[in-house]
Amino acid sequence: MSERKLFTSESVSEGHPDKIADQISDAILDAILAKDPEAHVAAETCVYTGSVHVFGEISTTAYVDINRVVRDTIAEIGYTEAEYGFSAESVGVHPSLVEQSPDIAQGVNEALEAREGQSDDFNVIGAGDQGLMFGFAIDETPELMPLPISLSHQLVRRLAALRKSGEISYLRPDAKSQVTVEYDEHDKPVRVDTVVISTQHDPEVSNDQIRQDMIEQVIKAVIPAHYLDEKTRFLINPTGRFVIGGPQGDSGLTGRKIIVDTYGGYARHGGGAFSGKDATKVDRSASYAARYIAKNLVAAGLASKAEVQLAYAIGVAQPVSVRVDTFGTSTVSESILEAAVRQVFDLRPAGIIKMLDLKRPIYKQTAAYGHMGRTDIDLPWEHLDKVSPLTEAVAALSEGA
């Protein structure tokens, strides 16, 4: 009998408490970068019933109306009714932002390499912290993402679209999805085993109505029919009721959905969150660079699955390590791939910032529905413009091996 395995990933909607916090943090970051592209920002947000606290460290010449940014973001998500227990115009906003530590700033503003006299513009900026970051790509989907997280994101995006268009009028902003995919003995996805959708709703609607709408208008609209069969389980609002939600039901905090933000647990994670951080924070920028590398390696046909690890020391520009793992799927040795990556990509913080143009206010749009594999927005780390340079570098290195 062939061995089959299950893998599960989840996503959450923009109205989930943790995602509200992420979006507020990134909205503040974008508002500052729009006026001061050189700003250093680390903005954290906590939300709960009737209150938003914004705290962290910022170095900027710009003035931003934090109160207005917070309220506008909450309204865009859909929390505009008092009965939700959390609404844009009545919520209390409590900012507490201070200047970045000078001890950290001296290493970011002048990297170790620059202090040692290595005259290169890209040696000026040091990494904002030590740490390790991962990027991943796999040929399971057109966007080169694992299928479970791809489907999970699509489900909650579809829910939000139906809510905002008014097509399903009883929907409220908070929601979660979870998809279990069955893989065959060759690690290829063959079917969807279980779909879980929990969606906040108005009190009057029946569970039968919710179930019917979720299956017909969400699940079947998103998941290709060949993945669904008579054994696929649909678990819709399994508790039986989800009226109280959002920050009224649970507190939310920036950076608590790092697996949702990346690969749904299918690949490793270095532990650093993204939202509210400018690109000198390698937790964010190097994770984007690692995805960029992995996606271009797979798109180039150099591997069918690739995981890239980058690691940094605070105040040092060059990464302390670069690793490529293709899980036995590469067409050449991983040492050649690593050498090609070092040739093609400048992985110093300033190099990443220039390569991906990361001083722009592009971050709020990433704060819900995933930072990787997005097909609905244009993100530079999803571009495939390094396929040819990588292919050429690998060919040259292979000849010289």
Swiss-Prot record:
Q: Where does Mg(2+) bind?
A: 18
Question: Which PROSITE patterns does the UniProt entry name for this protein?
Answer: ADOMET_SYNTHASE_1, ADOMET_SYNTHASE_2
Q: Which GO terms describe its cellular component?
A: cytoplasm
> In which residues is ATP bound?
16, 174-176, 241-242, 250, 256-257, 273, 277
Instruction: Write down the required cofactor(s).
Output: Mg(2+); K(+)
Q: Name one GO molecular function term.
A: ATP binding
Q: Which transformation does this protein catalyse, written as a reaction?
A: L-methionine + ATP + H2O = S-adenosyl-L-methionine + phosphate + diphosphate
One Gene Ontology BP term is: S-adenosylmethionine biosynthetic process
SUPFAM superfamilies on file: S-adenosylmethionine synthetase
In the Enzyme Commission scheme, what number(s) does this protein have? 2.5.1.6
Grouped into one coarse class, the protein's main location is: cytoplasm
Q: Which free-text remark accompanies the cofactor?
A: Binds 2 divalent ions per subunit.
Please list the residues that bind K(+).
Answer: 44
Q: Name one Pfam family in it.
A: S-AdoMet_synt_N
Q: In which pathway does it act?
A: Amino-acid biosynthesis; S-adenosyl-L-methionine biosynthesis; S-adenosyl-L-methionine from L-methionine: step 1/1
Task: Tell me the keywords, alphabetical order.
Answer: ATP-binding, Cytoplasm, Magnesium, Metal-binding, Nucleotide-binding, One-carbon metabolism, Potassium, Transferase
What residues does L-methionine bind to?
A: 57, 100, 250, 281
Which domain of life does the protein's organism represent? Bacteria
Give yes or no: UniProt keyword Lipid biosynthesis.
Answer: no
* Region spans: Flexible loop: 100-110
What family does the Swiss-Prot or TrEMBL record give for this protein? Belongs to the AdoMet synthase family.
Q: By its UniProt entry, which PANTHER family does this protein fall under?
A: S-ADENOSYLMETHIONINE SYNTHETASE
Function in brief:
Catalyzes the formation of S-adenosylmethionine (AdoMet) from methionine and ATP. The overall synthetic reaction is composed of two sequential steps, AdoMet formation and the subsequent tripolyphosphate hydrolysis which occurs prior to release of AdoMet from the enzyme.
Summarize the subunit comment: Homotetramer; dimer of dimers.
Which NCBIfam families has this protein been placed in?
A: metK
Question: What is this protein's record name?
Answer: S-adenosylmethionine synthase
